């Protein structure tokens, strides 16, 4: 018998870390969940990560970069590491930029008002982030994704993955 399976199974919310395990966070309107997406250059979804609503975006960055491979246009293995990544101001923090540079990924993230400006910010590359925003809009057309009906984060992530698959097929 395995030690982890010995004894009664936890009931209710026992054994789970609230807000992290089920990606439920508190906001003024009640519970909230953030959906972080990674898309390839054409705007197709590659990976998704869920976090609690009040969690900072930088905590999802590593998990998002570890997931998904982008198929190459020609022959060869899929790319696991993008050359650059564009994100909104929520991802703008020195630790997040440092972790992206350690992975040899150029961060194209505008700085927040309380941070010093970047002299080498690429506005043309940042405009490509529009594809991710449109991807989120297309995913939210599915009512089940726009409104989280599922109690469990794994079930909600399964619905998001199903929606991402539908977008790849259309």
For each predicted feature, which ranges?
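Basic, amphipathic alpha-helical segments enriched in Lys/Arg and hydrophobic/aromatic residues
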Residues: 98-104, 123-170
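Polybasic low-complexity intrinsically disordered regions
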Residues: 1-112, 163-164
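Short, charged, surface-exposed secondary-structure boundary motifs
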Residues: 116-121
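Short hydrophobic "helix-edge" motifs at membrane interfaces and signal-peptide entry regions
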Residues: 78-79, 122-124
